[in-house]
Amino acid sequence: MGQQPAKSMDVRRIEGGELLLNQLAGRMIPKGTVTWSGKFPTIDHLLDHVQTMEEVNTLQQQGAWPAGAGRRLGLTNPTPHETPQPQWTPEEDQKAREAFRRYQEERPPETTTIAPTSPTPWKLQPGDDPLLENKSLLETHPLYQNPEPAVPVIKTPPLKKKKMPGTFGGILAGLIGLLVSFFLLIKILEILRRLDWWWISLSSPKGKMQCAFQDTGAQISQHYVGSCPWGCPGFLWTYLRLFIIFLLILLVAAGLLYLTDNMSIILEKLQWESVSVLFSSISSLLPSDQKSLVALMFGLLLIWMTSSSATQTLVTLTQLATLSVLFYKN
C-alpha cells in the first residue's frame, strides 16, 4: 500500500528536463509589478530574458535535451537523428564507374571556341548623331581641339628654397670678426707684456723690480714694473714700451719680407700644402650649419674664460684654427 511503481530512467530524464525548463522559463516571465507604472518590463527582466534564451540556445545546439523534454518549448525532436550515409557495394560501384565511362565516350566533342575579339574603338563621328551634324561646331570648340587627359594633371609652381636672410649672415660675420679681433688683441698684448717683462728683467737688477712711480704720492698699492694699474704714472710708460716693441716686431717682419722679395718663399718654407691638407681635414669635421658653428665658438669662449693659462692657449689655437678653416672653406 502506498507504494508507487519505480520510474524508468527515460521518465526520470524527461522530468529532470522539464524541471530545468521550468527554472529557466521562470525568469522570462515577469512577476509582480513590472515597473513603477506597471506597463513595461524593467531592464533587469530584459537582461534575464536575454541570458535565459542564450542558455536555452546553447543547450539546444549542444544536443543536451533529453528525449521528450522539449515539448514545453514546442521542440518535438530536439536531437534530430543524423542522415544515414549511403553504402555502396563493390558491384554497384563498378556499375557506376562503367556508366560514367560510357557517358564520357558517347559524349559529343566540344565545339571549338572562337577567341574573343577586341572591341573596336568607338569614335564620335558627326554623321552618327543628328545633333552633331554641324562639323564646324566640333572643330571650333576648344575642348574638341585640345581634349583634356583622362587623369587631370595639376601643375604647381616649383617651391623656392628658403635662403637664409642676409641679416643673419651679416650678424654672424660681424660676430666672427669681433671674436677674431678680440682674441688677436688679447694674445698680442700677452706676447708684448712677456717681451716687456723680459726686457725689464735684462735691464734692471732682480731686487729693483718694484715700480718707481708708486712712491710719487698716489694712493696705489705696491706693484711690479710692467703691471701698473690705471692711475699710476707708469701706466702710460708701460703701454709706450709695448707700442715700441710692437713697432720693432713689425719692422723685423717687414725686413724679412723685403729680404725674401716674395712671400711665396716663406709659404713654401712653412709647407703650405700640408697646412691646407690639415685645414681641409678639420673642415670635414666641422658642422655645416652656421648656428652650430656659433654654438661651438661660444662654448670655446666659455672654456677659455674659465680655464688656466695652458688651457686658454690650447683653446685659442683651436679657435684660430676653426676660424681659419671657415675662411678657407669660403
Curated annotation (Swiss-Prot):
Residues 293-313 are annotated as: TM3. GO terms for cellular component: membrane; viral envelope; virion membrane. The record marks L240, R241 as: Cleavage. Keywords: Fusion of virus membrane with host membrane, Glycoprotein, Host-virus interaction, Lipoprotein, Membrane, Myristate, Phosphoprotein, Transmembrane, Transmembrane helix, Viral attachment to host cell, Viral envelope protein, Viral penetration into host cytoplasm, Virion, Virus entry into host cell. Residues 166-186 are annotated as: TM1. Residues 76-88 have a biased composition (Polar residues). InterPro entries: HBV_HBSAG. Myristoylation contributes importantly to DHBV infectivity. It is most likely required for an early step of the life cycle involving the entry or uncoating of virus particles. Phosphorylated on pre-S domain for about 50% of L proteins, the L chains with internal pre-S region (Li-HBsAg). Glycans are attached at N262. A lipid is attached at G2 (N-myristoyl glycine). Large internal envelope protein interacts with capsid protein. This is Large envelope protein. The gene is S.
